[in-house]
UniProtKB/Swiss-Prot annotation:
<feature type="binding site">
    <location>
        <begin position="79"/>
        <end position="80"/>
    </location>
    <ligand>
        <name>AMP</name>
    </ligand>
</feature>
<keyword id="KW-0378">Hydrolase</keyword>
<feature type="binding site">
    <location>
        <position position="49"/>
    </location>
    <ligand>
        <name>Fe cation 2</name>
    </ligand>
</feature>
<feature type="binding site">
    <location>
        <position position="196"/>
    </location>
    <ligand>
        <name>AMP</name>
    </ligand>
</feature>
<feature type="binding site">
    <location>
        <position position="10"/>
    </location>
    <ligand>
        <name>AMP</name>
    </ligand>
</feature>
<dbReference type="GO" id="GO:0000166">
    <property type="term" value="F:nucleotide binding"/>
</dbReference>
<protein>
    <recommendedName>
        <fullName>Probable cyclic nucleotide phosphodiesterase RPA0124</fullName>
        <ecNumber>3.1.4.-</ecNumber>
    </recommendedName>
</protein>
<dbReference type="InterPro" id="IPR004843">
    <property type="entry name" value="Calcineurin-like_PHP_ApaH"/>
</dbReference>
<dbReference type="InterPro" id="IPR026575">
    <property type="entry name" value="GpdQ/CpdA-like"/>
</dbReference>
<dbReference type="InterPro" id="IPR029052">
    <property type="entry name" value="Metallo-depent_PP-like"/>
</dbReference>
<dbReference type="Pfam" id="PF00149">
    <property type="entry name" value="Metallophos"/>
</dbReference>
<keyword id="KW-0408">Iron</keyword>
<feature type="binding site">
    <location>
        <position position="194"/>
    </location>
    <ligand>
        <name>Fe cation 2</name>
    </ligand>
</feature>
<feature type="binding site">
    <location>
        <position position="10"/>
    </location>
    <ligand>
        <name>Fe cation 1</name>
    </ligand>
</feature>
<feature type="binding site">
    <location>
        <position position="49"/>
    </location>
    <ligand>
        <name>Fe cation 1</name>
    </ligand>
</feature>
<dbReference type="GO" id="GO:0046872">
    <property type="term" value="F:metal ion binding"/>
</dbReference>
<feature type="binding site">
    <location>
        <position position="79"/>
    </location>
    <ligand>
        <name>Fe cation 2</name>
    </ligand>
</feature>
Length: 274
């Protein structure tokens, strides 16, 4: 099974820009590349912060761009989102009995669990898992088929990464999440967004991938405190392949427009410049 991961689209109303960028331009470029190069993917998942201010015109704009995707989409909530505004333009997206945007989808190759970490009451954008969401997670992990990998997706990381300000707005109750995992089942892979940086590693024995943002980025700065250092580093998406014996993640810089050449080309090898 193959799929694509995007995150932190931070959409705004048509005609608006944030930090000098138009998120719609970037997502349109990603959609075109995905349609052209990945016709065999099962879905595209967007792991939250769909809209920057959670306003209805932004979700309207997002829906228009995503309509161009040929693959199905799985959409998630991030700290910038508003569930009710989102639901007006994406009425077909499943919500659980408590109204949270989270699902379990069982594919032949893997089980996909999406977890809603949005806390709309938080003044500082940190995530939270209430009792209802922890119960959802416990049931999802306990009931997932044992004969295939389980991939867990959530917006907020449940751990620090060294990005000092971002560490103050991660998941607020990571121990509660871990307690559920410890008594049920460890996901085979954990996918997240929120940090606007490409980060990978292992959390308590679980390999993880944090996807770079589609819009503005968080600069690689492990010293800055009291604010979030931003940058215009180029965006990318992750192309994930799930096989019986491996999970492979490739990053695609879909807006790169520089030269392409063969490393076996002796002329290219000795060129001074392109």
């Amino acid at each position: 099974m193959k799929f694509v991961v995007l995150t932190d689209t931070h959409f705004v109303a048509r005609g608006r820009r944030i930090y000098g960028l138009d998120p719609a331009e970037r997502l349109s470029a990603a959609v075109a590349r995905i349609n052209r190069e990945h016709p065999d993917i099962a879905f595209v998942i967007v792991t939250g912060d769909l809209a920057h201010w959670g306003e209805e015109p932004a979700y309207d704009n997002l829906a228009s761009v995503l309509a161009g995707l040929r693959a199905p989409t799985i959409l998630m909530m991030g700290n910038h989102d508003k569930r009710e505004a989102f639901a007006k333009f994406f009425p077909g997206v499943p919500r659980d009995a408590s109204g949270f945007v989270q699902t379990v989808q069982v594919f032949e190759a893997a089980t996909i669990v999406t977890l809603d970490t949005l806390n709309e009451a938080a003044p500082n954008h940190e995530g939270f898992l209430c009792e209802a969401r922890l119960a959802f997670l416990e049931h999802a992990l306990a009931e997932a088929p044992a004969d295939r990998p389980l991939l867990l997706f959530q917006h907020h990381p449940p751990f620090d990464t060294g990005l000092r300000y971002m560490d103050t707005i991660r998941l607020a109750n990571p121990d509660a999440e871990w307690e559920v995992i410890a008594r049920t089942r460890k996901p085979d892979y954990l996918f997240m967004g929120h940090l606007h940086r490409p980060i990978s590693g292992v959390w308590r024995g679980i390999p993880f991938h944090i996807q770079r943002g589609l819009a503005h980025q968080v600069a690689f700065d492990l010293v800055a405190e009291g604010h979030i250092p931003g940058s215009h580093e180029p965006p990318d998406y992750a192309h994930v392949s799930v096989e019986a014996d491996r999970i492979v993640i490739h990053q695609c810089s879909f807006m790169y427009d520089g030269p392409l050449f063969s490393l076996h080309d002796s002329v290219a090898l000795h060129r001074v410049s392109f």
